[in-house]
Amino acid sequence: MIRISSRRMCRLILSIVSFLMFGVHAAQASETNIRVTDLAERTVILSHPAKRIILGESRYLFALSILNPDHPLDNIVGMLADLQSIDPGTYQQYQQRFPEIDDIPRVGHTSADSFSVEKVLSLNADLAIFGVEGHGPGARNAQLIDQLERAGVTVLFIDFRNDPLVNTVKSMRLLGHVLGQNTRADAFVEYYQAQLDRVVKPLAIAMAKHPQHSPAVFLHSRVGLQDLCCETMARGMMAAFLDNVGGQNIAKERVPGSAGILNLEYLLTEQPDIYIATAIGAAQNLEADAANQPPYIVLGAGVSRSDAQASFQRAIKESALGSLTAVRNGHAYAIWHHFYNTPLNIAAVQVFAKWLYPQTFADLDPHATLETLYQRFQPVPLNGTYWVELDTKAGRS
């Protein structure tokens, strides 16, 4: 019979208890891990909600603001400079309410090539939020992703660009999980889906009762960016909005990828029923020397309707697109380009629905939808013009 002293027995018991407690804590830690599948179909695991975040595109501030509208910048330790460069109107709104936005380190400019892994690693980040595709690092940047994850920076992929009307909801739920903001994410998703239903359901009913002609649409992307006529979107981005509302995108059969060029001769031959331009100009363009500015259409934060209309008139005049039947017949419109890369895209979908089927959607009010999105889910007020119809009478005066 083996005898164990009381002192050794106490030590043994303490050791066993410590071992068991370690096992309990390990199990609890495992159970509390955040585990999701991102939109690049990768398993992403965090031990706790992210506290030090890198934004692969600073335009994702729209999404993060939905989850934390009072303090959207609190956990951002670095970001690309695209918002300030590409959408200065919105950046200025954030700057006015949150001056500290200027102090957030920039980890690149407006491209994946400019993204600095070294800078990110110096910021002790625990999560990097990237788009599957876009201006920042994407799912194809395998070496960069590997570098970050080897250094302890978890990478999460979201998407508002490739398949926006499917992946906006998925992306917001993912962000809600990894940031510990599920309640806010669920509230947004509920509103988003309700507003999408206001397009999808009436359109399905109308088509079933009275099959309608599907309008042929030319989507003219980033008007004024280059002299060559005319850049367009064929798949994903705003082309997905057209698909959702039953528009016939004339670029689909001619452009093999997501975006490309349709020349003016083709447009004059095809003569689309509707012309929609995307506007990359901002209020800041109006402050510069207008004579030396490209013919951008100006929309977005801080832009008046009259300035938007004047810029649209100029763009049409300088591009020779005034000869399109859609323009002459009063079916020419422009919309804020950056809807394609934010969860606020549902307002643009509703706008497209009204432009294509004005009778079916006579009671739909996209501006009210956008107002609600800003009031409930954004930290800055809705202040600007985000879409406009070309005033053909003004063009003839």
Predicted regions and their residues:
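N-terminal ligand-binding lobe of clamshell/alpha-beta domains
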Residues: 27-397
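A general, composition-driven signal for non-globular sequence regions
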Residues: 1-5, 19-22, 266
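Bacterial N-terminal signal peptides
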Residues: 11-23
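Bacterial N-terminal signal peptides that target proteins for export
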Residues: 2-14
